[in-house]
Amino acid sequence: MNYKVTVLGAGLAGCEAALWLAGKGVQVDLYEQKPVHFSPAHKSAGFAELICSNSLKAERLDSASGLLKEEMRRMGSQLLNAAETARVAAGGALAVDRDAFSAEVTRMVESCENITVHRERVEHI
């Protein structure tokens, strides 16, 4: 059976969902409004743009964010793989170079043959 899924937004969740679906053989249309339109918080055209470098938080398994990341790793999270390539020293937190992380996620998504990126703003569903 052939499936096609539309994902709105190339933030963290949208990119993770698109990559996961594409990895399962699903054709994905990913819509991202940047660089056509920017929100007040976003400055770059890249995907998965983080507002601060430590947005991925603690790695300790006794913390909610650490446990969530461990579960995501076990499920094959592509974004956590990207985070490892952009990692910077931050004690017990998973912190990344924001630009390097966004560039890697953008590269991963744009190079995936099952994902078609549409750089346009979606006004209505």
Where are these regions (language model features)?
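Beta1/beta-strand and adjacent pyrophosphate-binding region of the FAD-binding site
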Residues: 1-13
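Fold-independent oxyanion-binding glycine-rich loops
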Residues: 10, 32-33, 120-122
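Feature captures the FAD/FMN-dependent oxidoreductase FAD-binding
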Residues: 71-125
